[in-house]
Amino acid sequence: ERDKRVPVLDLPVEKDDTDTMAAVRWAVSEGFSEIRLYCALGGRLDHLMGNIQALGFACERGVKASLLGRDARVFLLKNDAVTIPPLPGYSLSVLALTDRVEHVCISGVKYPLQDALVTNTFPIGVSNEWEGTANISCGNGILLVINAKK
């Protein structure tokens, strides 16, 4: 029997949103400050990209959102900073979700960046390695941060 305390969205099969996007829209409209999507990283590439875009929808509205899986964690930064302790056996990647992300700084890693411009047509931030606690910050634009098992 279903737990009545957990809301269930009854959605039509044919709709403009994916199920994940509908859930993210609902959570944003309900005023949630953080959204965690589990088991949304595997399977079809088109769905993964759609899930990342759903994170962007939340981010544009000031809501922190992440995709969490067994072997990876994905989240976005916009005019923000984050500190991530070393995760042995995992890489750290940063990519531009928007056309460009300005003033990207990464320290505590093998390949640091200082006040860099990161664009979505050049993957300069892929597969970095921890040398200590990583500090990541960015200005204008949306930065995609990925911790993935090597």
Annotate each PLM feature.
Residues P12, G62-S66, S93, R100-V101:
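A glycine-rich helix N-cap at a beta->alpha junction
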Residues L77-K150:
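Long, charged alpha-helical interface segments
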